[in-house]
């Protein structure tokens, strides 16, 4: 529910040229047109968007990667704050949390408080480009949120080399009350978890 009117809207993204947009649910969602509004058009190489309350204000924000090595935000990832009036906003406010430190064709995002400090940390994976000069990838990482979520976060690589690294999600897999990380190596490469 992007606009706060009580019904669900849709969020979508385009890879290249990059675009994050939301579609406002009409009165009759089966017959009427869903109006598209742009949230961001400067992130390039978006593989997915995810909603999370990054800044702790009780409202959902959007996460998106900028996985291409070119453009205004190369090899980066961002979160977008939903404006007070999303119907009227030309673009949403963008905060880069991974500032040029996510090379290698980053893919999907996750979130959770990985270090137990009460702040939302963010996760990301990169599978690698066919041409390694653009970034070898093959990593899983998490970005530690600081006191000010509008500033870049601190990157922590998880151990190992991970061909096909695509999905990464925090979850308490062993039931000890602490978040672990489950991660997939796409294209038949496997599934693993980090404690």
Give the predicted meaning of each segment.
Residues 1-195:
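Beta-propeller-forming repeat regions
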């Amino acid at each position: 529910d992007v606009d706060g009117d009580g019904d669900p809207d849709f969020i979508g993204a385009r890879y290249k040229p990059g675009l994050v947009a939301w579609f406002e649910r009409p009165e009759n969602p089966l017959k009427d047109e869903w109006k598209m509004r742009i949230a961001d058009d400067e992130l390039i190489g978006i593989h997915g968007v995810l909603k999370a309350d990054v800044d702790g204000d009780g409202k959902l924000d959007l996460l998106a990667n900028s996985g291409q090595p070119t453009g205004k935000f190369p090899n980066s990832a961002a979160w977008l704050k939903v404006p007070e009036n999303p119907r009227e906003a030309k673009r949403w406010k963008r905060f880069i949390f991974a500032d040029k430190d996510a090379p290698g064709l980053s893919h999907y995002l996750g979130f959770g408080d990985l270090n137990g400090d009460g702040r939302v940390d963010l996760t990301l994976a990169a599978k690698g480009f066919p041409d390694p000069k653009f970034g070898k990838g093959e990593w899983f990482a998490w970005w530690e949120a600081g006191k000010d979520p509008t500033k870049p976060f601190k990157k922590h690589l998880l151990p190992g080399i991970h061909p096909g690294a695509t999905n990464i999600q925090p979850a308490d897999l062993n039931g000890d009350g602490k978040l672990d990380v489950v991660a997939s190596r796409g294209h038949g490469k496997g599934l693993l978890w980090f404690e």
